[in-house]
Amino acid sequence: MDYGKKKLMADDCLKTLKFVSSDVFQYKISKILLWLVLAIHGTITLVGTYFLLGKFNRKQFMNFVPSYLATFYPLLAIWTLLFRGELISNIKNEVEMWTIDSAGEKVHRQIKNQATFMTIFAVVNFLISIVGGCLYLVPLSEDVDTFVAFYLFHNYFPNQEKYLSSIYRMTFLMLGYLMIVHGYQIIYYSEHGRYQSTLLKEHVANLDSCERQTNEEKLFYDDEYQKRIHLRLVFCVKRSVKFVELIERKNREITNLIGVFSICGCLLGIGIVLHLLSGNLTEGYCLRLALLSIGTAAVFSALFWSGQTVEDQSEEIVAALHALNWYNFDKNNKKIYLIMLTNAMQTHRVKFTENYSVNYDLGVQIVKSIYSIISVMVNMI
């Protein structure tokens, strides 16, 4: 295995995922559409807040609050794309990304299969979100009693109701898409982190696989062997430091975003569950909610899974270090080995606070939060 200068990634194995989650929003027309949708739904949300708090009776409040709660997630998604849209667009320029064939054919096939699976998942879930958005283009009689916007158009702008409703419905094409975009961005970042960690792990695992003498005890006094180990250790340490720097830098960038998105995700889940509990379910609404729930649950599950795999891969690097025959290293090499082991034992996570990271535990906490809030609200009805 080569421990010299590596070829850098030219062709992104997750380019489809990057395009639908970032690149497409770099065009001027995309930004104009985002501003337009933000203006429309931001205005409706502000007016809806006034009506929910001061105008609607209890029954109306329970009818309208599910769709109201569900609007905060896409609004946050739009704001982030407009003001923090460079999150993953230049990741290849922020750290040297090795080609996925840098650690042998077996690892190459493994990473390629993982990237193919993630690409297929992204495309299928993207299509589900688009179809889900299209369903909102079809008017349902219950819309006027479910969405604040249609209630306002019907009661305050009857002459322009058809025109205003059509414009508002068109925005759902983008909203369905926006529900998955930022999950895709974190998945893209996490997956590339996992691939690069896998490549590093293979280099660590083969670090002491030099041609050995028959008597292994003599390796400690073999200057040529120790020199080769030294070069490989330094190579792996430098790579791990760059990787840690990238994770820490990205964690600083997304610290606040993940927390706020988690809160909005809870509100979205509460809105969906409240609508299911309302009993106002027709065939059309069931289909809408089914696609929304499937698409959202799928991308959130993939998000937590990707974050968890970054942690798991970090632990595998530690295991690979422990498996080395470090007792054959000389004093200087042992010091370098201990430095790398100490750094590696600090598990790398995609996190937004000291206590919470993007992993399975966060997913469980969100589900528990949704359940607790729903229980309180049901008891209040």
Q: What is the predicted role of each segment?
A:
Residues E94-W98, H203-N206, A323, Y327, ...:
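A short linear boundary/processing microfeature
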Residues I44, A70, N90-N93, F172, ...:
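Generic structural signal for well-ordered, non-membrane alpha-helices
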Residues E86, G132, S165-Y168, Y195, ...:
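Active-site-proximal helix/loop capping residues that flank conserved catalytic or ligand/cofactor
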